[in-house]
């Protein structure tokens, strides 16, 4: 009986330790990821009733960027009583953990500012981030990029505040938003020079560790890696002939 009791105690301790270890790994790889109210509240916010820009150049620039998300399946509307809308099956599940071939541009940069904008027809919403580049790892875009320069990057989703005071959160399943003041390796695409760079995916660099921004299973393979080792491995991959 004594040995059975000892065995049960040992198994209980083992189960507790395993649960702690799994929870620790989950926190390491998914910290700051969607599903947390505080994190949702950090997403860029725009007003549904935002006035039109009066400067013709700024208005033309914003309309050129906003046309990408017209006729959005988000169907942003003030009469929608829901708290959130999530678009599913929009992220390519076959995307490699390091999508260097799929990216025009790969940079290390710090997020300086974030804003949300409605599409031209107000059916969609997207978030735009101003990035200060620390290091250009790849650039096949027509725009020359140098360390220290500023660029705008964007991705679909954001929060919209209606005149009633109601705030609706619009997201793409398994995609998250970078946070102001944080440093990331960004994998970017762009098809039109009038557009901001589009975030394919990104990895946050924090405390000399790597944290995937998005939630596809293959991205977790990079979670917790040493920052220097991660960047060096990425450079090697980028310099390897395809």
What do these predicted regions represent?
Residues 2-242:
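Transition segments tied to proteolytic processing and entry into folded domains
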């Amino acid at each position: 009986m004594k040995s059975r009791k000892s065995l049960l105690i040992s198994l209980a301790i083992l189960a507790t330790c395993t649960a702690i270890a799994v929870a620790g790994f989950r926190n390491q790889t998914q910290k700051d990821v969607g599903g947390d109210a505080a994190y949702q509240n950090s997403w860029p916010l725009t007003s549904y009733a935002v006035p039109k820009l009066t400067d013709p150049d700024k208005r033309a620039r914003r309309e050129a960027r906003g046309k990408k998300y017209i006729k959005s399946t988000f169907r942003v509307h003030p009469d929608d009583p829901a708290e959130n809308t999530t678009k599913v099956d929009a992220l390519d599940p076959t995307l490699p953990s390091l999508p260097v071939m799929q990216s025009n541009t790969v940079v290390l940069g710090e997020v300086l500012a974030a804003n949300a904008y409605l599409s031209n027809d107000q059916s969609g919403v997207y978030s735009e981030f101003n990035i200060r580049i620390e290091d250009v790892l790849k650039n096949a875009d027509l725009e020359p990029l140098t360390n220290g320069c500023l660029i705008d990057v964007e991705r679909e989703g954001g929060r919209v505040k209606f005149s009633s005071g109601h705030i609706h959160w619009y997201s793409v399943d398994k995609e998250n938003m970078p946070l102001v003041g944080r440093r990331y390796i960004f994998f970017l695409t762009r098809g039109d020079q009038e557009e901001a760079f589009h975030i394919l995916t990104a990895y946050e660099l924090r405390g000399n560790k790597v944290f995937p921004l998005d939630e596809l299973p293959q991205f977790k393979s990079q979670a917790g890696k040493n920052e220097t080792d991660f960047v060096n491995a990425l450079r090697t991959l980028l310099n390897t002939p395809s």
